Every structure is written in C-alpha cells, then in structure tokens.
Amino acid sequence: MIYLSLGSNLGDRAENLRVARELLAEALQAEPVCSAVLETEAIGFDGPAFLNQVISFESDIAPEALLDRCQEIEEKLGRPHHAAMYDPTTGRRLYSNRTIDIDIMIYNDLEYHTDRLTLPHPQVQSRPFVRTLLDNIKQRNNL
C-alpha cells in the first residue's frame, strides 16, 4: 500500500485537496482510499492553517515516477517547483504557503534513499497530524 499526504493552505483548500485526489487517481489509474481531513497550523513558518489528508492506493508505479507525477500535479495546481530554500544562518529548510503539497509518506515496506526521495518520508513520525491521519486511513483499509 502506498500512502500520500496532501496539504493546502492557500485558496479553496478543500477544493485543492479534491482536485489533487482526482488528478492522482487519473494519473495512477487507481481509486484512493481517503482519510478524514484535518486542519493544522502551518509548521516552520507563519501562514494560514492547512487542510491535510492522507490517501492510500495500490500501484506498481516506481517510487521516482510517483514523485514525478506528484510534482506535476503540484505544478498544475499552482505550486512552482524549484530547489528547496534554506536559511543561510541556520541551514534549516524554509517552508512556505502552498496551494497543494503532495508527499509520499510510505511506499509499501520499501526503505529507499536518493537525492530526490527518501522513503519512508523523514517526517512520517515527527508530525503528529500525519500519524493521526495514517492511523485513520489504516482503520478505513482494515489494516
């Protein structure tokens, strides 16, 4: 099972999540199971609250190809992709507002690391809302 987290804090957040789910289902030829939607404060920067959701599906798409599809959908929904920005003083990654954010959280039981992608996602354990939504969707999947 593959688990993606979706988040939006700009525009019509619920609609952004809906369109992202629809585009992912179309791109992956798979109907996702969806968690509840949870509103959370922005983490790592001052900004509007996020709506977050986790979706799961089965697919044989390769991890890097899945990342490409996710980034294409983010761009289509108005999120530009460029190199991550870092604070020159602290070296910490700078976060920002976004119409949509799609992260691959878990890809089956795969442990994977390249310059572009780490699986499971490094923040899968450190963000309580992600754990909550993962637990919610696993219950819906009867896992």
Model-predicted segments: where are they?
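Flexible, gly/pro- and Lys/Arg-enriched active-site loops
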Residues: 11-12, 35, 42-50, 61-143
